[in-house]
């Protein structure tokens, strides 16, 4: 049998994060064809010269990712704690070089962990199980959301996934206004990274978290809940299911968690008092 070698083609699309490669279909193994595949690269977040975490991510909107990660992990309290940021190539991927305030950097050094995650993984590298959970202040109850507005948002979620439409390989996170309109959506090969990009962008733009909800195309893990709550998000909608730990965290921090979101369908796990129908 003749050996074949996979051939990678120069990126000929206009979309960052997509590359064309040569591949074979099941019904025609004799003739290769070109198809689009989502890029996944190691991204190191380097604070004041010290590498803190390496995540696998899509190579775009990395400044938003770094800001959102810093906020949702409790490294900073506001975007003002970051004095500067640069994205630079490294030997095997990309580095986001972040200049923290002295006070925040001292706090980071006290709890620093070496983390090398798989795609969007935020638990890998934690030294003890007790370190997984982060203290989250209970959220206020400032709004109600009409579930009838959810259906239109679900139909438009993939508008924020240009890479996903080409490759079938990304998750999306978007902000949903009370009207059901989606604004400020982001995509990534990692669901946690997509959420961090959304959190970072809205925080940088000074947007309120109290008039609307986050909608994600993935399941709702405990970390998705925790990241949302750390930034003040009161309602999280997920297209897929929630885990038991996600439900426990949502209950504890007063976050309204909704899963299995499809047109005409939704499962409310916690705090339904924020919802109407």
From Swiss-Prot:
Mo-bis(molybdopterin guanine dinucleotide) binds at residues 260-265. Coiled coil: none annotated. It comes from the Bacteria. One of its GO terms (cellular component) is cytoplasm. Keywords: Cytoplasm, Molybdenum cofactor biosynthesis. It holds the Pfam family FdhD-NarQ. One of its GO terms (molecular function) is sulfur carrier activity. One of its GO terms (biological process) is Mo-molybdopterin cofactor biosynthetic process. The keyword Thylakoid does not apply. The active site is at 121 (cysteine persulfide intermediate). Belongs to the FdhD family. NCBIfam families: fdhD_narQ (TIGR00129). Required for formate dehydrogenase (FDH) activity. Acts as a sulfur carrier protein that transfers sulfur from IscS to the molybdenum cofactor prior to its insertion into FDH. This is Sulfur carrier protein FdhD.
